[in-house]
């Protein structure tokens, strides 16, 4: 009897400290790896801070990380793994739009909350319409494409007074969604693209498309692609001695654009949710110092990805605390009705979500960055002061 009782006590004690398993799917290899690895590190840093403070509901967080390589088919397999084998209670992650589009239904059907930390297609948080008592389990803490595109166009049309703008977008879902949003944003200014180019991943010949864009009188290039192909674009422009600005989505801040383009990437401008700065203080200084200490590096390959991953984990954690439960529906309802502000890197989140709006970032949050001497800095002093 005593042995049985001891076993029961041990079993209950073990159950009481079982970790809360959070899935972290993302591209940790391939061309999107700078985003994926930075995102993962941001999530790890947030989880480490939460665990140092006692965890959630008296239990530690355990991250279950899986590499989808930026491939939609692998993303579906990762989702199935995380749901059926790893039994995660929620997910923070997703780098590539195509992967998120392919895999998000698995989580929605399983009623497991997802915090998108990088993938930006506008449709992602709106693809599961609300009917009656149904819930949408997809949230985001990143600048969606329908938020970025108007800022890109505003930078080109209002700030720079360009009227002839070419669009270069890759042939992924990311590029397609971005192209649509850029065309829509140009249309709001009464403009159409001077030229549109689509190209494949690992494209190594952009000269013909750039020649046509130049012949169309394009004054600047608007981009929706990722680092390696963006570098090829900048390098080809340099070989052609065609000096027009590159203005694009946040991926122009990726390390594999800046490194591979070298001096040819100087001056490229992009939308950013977060720019590390030597004058940072408070929460931003703590985040940067913590990242550099924990991961033994002075450089973040994709700073917005790291900050968004960090903030996404913090928002999810606060929802779990408020819900007092690991039930997916309870976590969703808590996210939609957060009572306490959440101090993040990008901003302090005060009721960032509602039942009908699952986007944490609004139009007034992102800023414009530019590549200067191999790193991204604020393009405008006013943005630095505002952030």
What are these regions (language model features)?
Residues 2-11:
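Bacterial N-terminal signal peptides
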